[in-house]
Swiss-Prot record:
Record SUPFAM superfamilies: Periplasmic binding protein-like II
Classification of source organism: Bacteria, Pseudomonadati, Pseudomonadota, Gammaproteobacteria, Enterobacterales
Main location: periplasm
Protein name: Maltose/maltodextrin-binding periplasmic protein
Family designation: Belongs to the bacterial solute-binding protein 1 family.
Subcellular location field: Periplasm
Amino acid sequence: MKIKTGARILALSALTTMMFSASALAKIEEGKLVIWINGDKGYNGLAEVGKKFEKDTGIKVSVEHPDKLEEKFPQVAATGDGPDIIFWAHDRFGAYAQSGLLAEITPDKAFQDKLYPFTWDAVRYNGKLIAYPVAVEALSLIYNKDLVPNPPKTWEEIPALDKALKAKGKSALMFNLQEPYFTWPLIAADGGYAFKFENGKYDVKNVGVDSAGAKAGLTFLVDLIKNKHMNADTDYSIAEAAFNKGETAMTINGPWAWSNIDKSKVNYGVTLLPTFKGKPSKPFVGVLSAGINAASPNKELAKEFLENYLMTDPGLEAVNNDKPLGAVAVKSFQEKLEKDPRIAATMANAQKGEIMPNIPQMSAFWYAVRTAVINAASARQTVDAALKDAQGRITK
């Protein structure tokens, strides 16, 4: 193994020398890796992985976390500039790939097998792999162990639980009803879907927003509101405050919410989202991914860094120790992280969920479904009319 690594590093050094002499005009510096990652992620940990890479190869790695990098990247990459590697949630990468800004990646089968298969689906665009999946985010049911030691397994149990808790001055469940990202798991459980995914691509005309299953899910949500088990005006901050003050027994949120709950000292657990009609809730799954700039002259170096330095147990551990990654795509490191039941639950919900489509048409989906849920929840429209309108807006 050591000989192989040594040979690989020699080959990379030779490649770098060749690249230096090849083109002095490229905007992206050759023989150096520049990485962009968001400021809320473990960029110091990533820089440590970069130091190890530099020590082994002599190639300097610079980790930057510019503001609004997801908007800056397409602007600079279109002119042949920007970072060699960009980290962001996978759903932005479809538009980048459509504009020709990301290099196709070609990991071998042995490397692909190290990751959970569903994570590769997140970084496929028109049948090609356009990034490496790194970490996995999905909503889970978060519950107050002192109020509900055994959280409900089904949505159908929630009205009776709420009745019992109301008698004690509490409520069963509060979560953000203003954003479809949070309401979608229930709407999708019985067969709703955003865009049909077939043969490695999305069919933008095959939308499941006004399917029978979506109507059943939204009708159940509207009934919870009509029967005063939930309030149509609940948004993210209202739900978070109610849970963290111990006023409501459960909420639906992701790993980013855990640190505030930790500070609130609520005795909480994270578990599977409830089933609806016997079927699992289907949260949208976001995958933090690493793409390689199509304009980079350092594509082989970027591949070496990502596959053999970052996407290893020690590499991911360095980033995770800086800022928790949540669940991860690499099986061996996920198995270590799953000792934390919160992370095991995140991955279990993700595996039952729906990969967030990485296509530009998602902006129309978010807008239309948001309006539909708000209108149905506030009784401005019937469920059928609201979802029919949404379907029309998305497919027009």
